[in-house]
Regions:
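Interfacial loop/beta elements and low-complexity acidic/Ser/Thr-rich segments
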Residues: 1-35
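Short acidic, gly/pro-rich beta-turn/loop elements at beta-sheet edges
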Residues: 12, 16, 67, 164
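Amphipathic, interface-forming alpha-helical segments with heptad-repeat character
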Residues: 31-158
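Short acidic loop-to-helix transition motifs that present clustered carboxylates
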Residues: 161
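Long, charge-rich amphipathic alpha-helical coiled-coil "stalk/tentacle" segments
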Residues: 164-183
Length: 183
């Protein structure tokens, strides 16, 4: 990302030897795909049951909107007052982590963990992984677009009842299985 006295002048992607005005400053940003393996967080599902849910996210910076990651996300300077590529990427990773937690909480709160009705065709976190993953990708894309970040893939990698109610819910599932087996 090239700036001329703090004003954005363009992005440069080519390798090799190139002449650039010496008054322009360049900020290097990696375009590689990155992974985020979010630790499971405790949220309430649609029915109010506490669950533990985690996600795996693959993301990268959009080539055409890389300037957004430089100007729209605040990066802290080191002791010498210079923002390094490493600190800028850490701030982007932190931004992605916070936004992914918020999107995961939002999606988990919209659906029940499991279907307790007789019809069995409602969308739940446990049985409808494709629909949930698509919705999660959509929510993450909305949140991360302001930083020029593209969501490559988002999946739920951990889903369980919270420890305080896990035993009770297991007994409930076993009882439902016994009742349905008798019918």
């Amino acid at each position: 990302v090239l700036t001329f006295f703090g004003e954005y002048r363009g992005s440069f992607y080519n390798t090799g030897f190139w002449w650039v005005n010496f008054l322009m400053s360049a900020k290097n940003i990696s375009l590689r795909a990155r992974n985020l393996n979010a630790e499971p967080i405790k949220v309430n599902d649609k029915t109010g049951n506490p669950i533990m849910i985690g996600l795996v996210l693959v993301w990268r910076l959009k080539r055409d909107e890389i300037y957004r990651s430089v100007f729209d996300i605040d990066a802290t300077a080191d002791n010498s007052g210079i923002v390094t590529q490493g600190s800028r990427m850490k701030m982007l990773e932190n931004f992605v982590s916070v936004q992914s937690d918020a999107a995961l909480r939002q999606v988990a709160g919209c659906y029940a963990y499991d279907d307790n009705t007789a019809d069995g065709d409602t969308v739940t976190l446990r049985s409808s992984s494709e629909e949930i993953s698509d919705l999660l990708e959509e929510r993450l894309s909305e949140r991360l677009a302001i930083a020029g970040i593209e969501v490559v893939e988002a999946r739920i990698n951990y889903l369980a009842y919270a420890p305080e109610i896990a035993a009770v819910m297991l007994r409930r599932q076993q009882a439902d299985a016994i009742i349905s087996a008798r019918e």
